[in-house]
Amino acid sequence: LNPKYIINTHWHDDHTRGNEDLAKELSVKIVQHNASQLKNDLTVSDGDSIKFGCSELAVYHTPGHSKDSICLVGDGKIFSGDTLFVGNCGRIDLPGGSAKELYHGLFDVIANLSDDLVLYPGHDYGSSSTSTIGKEKQTNPVMQKMNEDSFVDRMGG
């Protein structure tokens, strides 16, 4: 295994602590969304791709949990950081959080992706460590069809 990048799905310390030291040790680049204020080597925006070996990850900007939250999609998988969990979604009560932005990330972006994508969230809070977008649309309370105002009320924000 020859890593090329460390990709931060958002700036929160539980996802980025130690990444600068690890990047130096492995001689790899740190990648994150251009809205992040953390030190990085490469920034990405919505619609960009990160290429490595024979693979490629498409970048989807999904703010809401934080301003710089991204999801990465490739090879039948979605790495959702703290935007979407199995059975839930990321908090909005931290700096940069926004229920309205999270609503649009979940319903305008993620809900329109293939139901077959295997979900790999940033934390294992659910009954399983992985799921699919289709299953989350069926069973995850935050992915049930609702309007923006209802979602914002549900999230308390």
Task: Label every PLM stretch briefly.
Residues I6-T16, Y60-D68, L119-G126:
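Histidine-centered catalytic micro-motifs
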Residues A35, T62, T83:
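Short strand-turn motif at the edge of the Rossmann-like AdoMet-binding core
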Residues S49, H61, C71:
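Ligand/cofactor pocket segment of small-molecule handling proteins
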Residues E56, K67-G156:
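Metallo-beta-lactamase
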Residues L1-A58, Q138-V142:
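Active-site HxH/HxHxD metal-binding segment of metal-dependent hydrolases
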Residues V44, T62, I133:
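Hydrophobic residues at beta-strand termini and immediately following loops
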